[in-house]
Swiss-Prot record:
Family under the similarity heading: Belongs to the TER reductase family.
Site keyed Plays an important role in discriminating NADH against NADPH: positions: E75
HAMAP family: FabV_reductase
Pfam families xref list: Eno-Rase_FAD_bd (PF07055), Eno-Rase_NADH_b (PF12242), Enoyl_reductase (PF12241)
Species per Swiss-Prot/TrEMBL record: Shewanella frigidimarina (strain NCIMB 400)
Gene3D superfamilies cross-referenced by the UniProt entry: NAD(P)-binding Rossmann-like Domain
Protein name: Enoyl-[acyl-carrier-protein] reductase [NADH]
Coiled-coil features, chain-numbered ranges: none
Length: 400
């Protein structure tokens, strides 16, 4: 079929398999160009490995450190009438390129919150790898099916205490709008913590630990975003922020357990990037368009892959073997460049000046749109989008 982008709300409902493969290849080439990570991990589990930071973590582990990787994700293959999800094609491409270089690559398509997923991963590690030395937790799911009861809990992207009103961009109409989001109820806050907090990360780590598949020096990291006062009402001070604070709680608990065997657990606070997850958060697309332009001008721009390479090479696996610098909450801060005062002041000054007419001129909004489409395999140089492509891409995947 010939596949063109179709946007609905903040998601693109179509994907291009050849474009997704090109994206993955581009990330791999970038890692290869940066060079090997001297003390990098060798056997890595990535929970939430099919897009965004999770995918970049799998690529960095495999191609930056020659690691064997197991990826866990929830994606859909193509059907008779429509292509598969971007994450399906991303993982198929990763698997192809990893195996071509003789790297161990196993993928499990499942509900990562389930007991079954954890058991399958444990069996796979015991059978093929013995133990693992790195666990990346990078789930970005709006819902969680509770593994014991089957109850489905939903998260909310809402402020706490009062209605949040701010200037935002309507990404469908490319216009500047005022958006208002009603505050979350106590139940919605609690549910958001249940879905996006640290509980499932802890469940993964205890299941792996009890099964004896964690190596003595095993590191684990989960990803977070804090941002600044520009996005705090909807993010850090909102329901989502409460979940991310629970991730901090989990990191402290896990770190004290792993410390005994020479391991560690940290939250890594990353910069804002264009991902399927961030595009769903009100105000984030406009903020990203502003901050990206300034960071590009300052030569500080990073995408997911650059961030994760820096996390691995300069924080978790330093050449000198020293412990990484952390903040007062034991977090690894990779948002340090974005939070520079001159960058943030620029955004604070610019925010009230942006209109529909000057949006493309004052910000990198056009680039934001391009990067968003690229997530789904569209708008990539060298690909003929008028050509017929086969949406049915198969690879070595365990379906649960």
């Amino acid at each position: 079929m010939i596949i063109k982008p179709k946007i609905r709300g903040f998601i693109c409902t179509t994907t291009h398999p050849v474009g997704c493969e090109a994206n993955v290849k581009e990330q791999i080439e970038l890692i290869k160009a940066k060079g090997k990570i001297a003390n990098g991990p060798k056997k890595v589990l990535v929970v939430g490995s099919s897009s965004g930071y999770g995918l970049s973590s799998r690529i960095t582990s495999a191609f930056g450190s020659d690691a064997a990787t197991i990826g866990v994700f929830f994606e859909k293959p193509s059907s008779e009438t429509k292509p598969g999800t971007a994450g399906w094609y991303n993982t198929a491409a990763f698997d192809k390129f990893a195996k071509a270089e003789g790297l161990y690559s196993k993928s499990i398509n499942c509900d990562a919150f389930s007991h079954q997923a954890k058991q399958q991963v444990i069996e796979l590690i015991k059978q093929d790898l013995g133990q693992i030395d790195m666990v990346v937790y990078s789930l970005a799911s709006p819902v969680r099916k509770m593994p014991d009861t089957g109850e489905v809990i939903r998260s909310s992207l809402k402020p706490i205490g009062q209605t949040y009103t701010a200037t935002a961009v309507d990404t469908n109409k490319n216009t500047i709008i005022d958006t208002s989001v009603e505050p979350a109820t106590e139940q919605e806050i609690a549910d958001t913590v249940t879905v996006m907090g640290g509980q499932d990360w802890e469940l993964w780590m205890s299941a792996l630990s009890e099964a004896g598949v964690l190596a003595d020096n095993c590191k684990t990291v989960a990803y977070s975003y804090i941002g600044t006062e520009l996005t705090w009402p909807i993010y850090w001070h909102g329901a989502l922020g409460k979940a991310k604070m629970d991730l901090d709680r989990a990191a402290h608990a896990l770190d004290s357990k792993l410390f005994a065997t020479g391991g560690s657990a940290n939250v890594a606070v990353l910069k804002s990037v264009v991902t399927q997850a961030s595009s769903a958060i009100p105000v984030m697309p406009l903020y990203i368009a502003m901050v990206f332009k300034k960071m590009r001008q300052e030569g500080l721009h990073e995408g997911c892959i650059e961030q994760i390479y820096r996390l691995f090479s300069e924080r978790l696996y330093r050449v000198d073997g020293q412990a990484p610098a952390v903040d007062s909450e034991n977090r690894l801060r990779l948002d340090d460049w974005e939070l520079r005062e001159e960058i943030q002041q620029h955004c604070r000054d610019l925010w009230p000046l942006v209109t529909t007419e000057n949006l493309s001129e004052l910000t990198d909004y056009n680039e934001y749109k391009e990067e968003f489409l690229k997530l789904f395999g569209f708008g990539i140089d060298g690909i003929d989008y008028e050509a017929e492509v086969d949406p049915n891409v198969t690879f070595d995947v365990i379906e649960l």
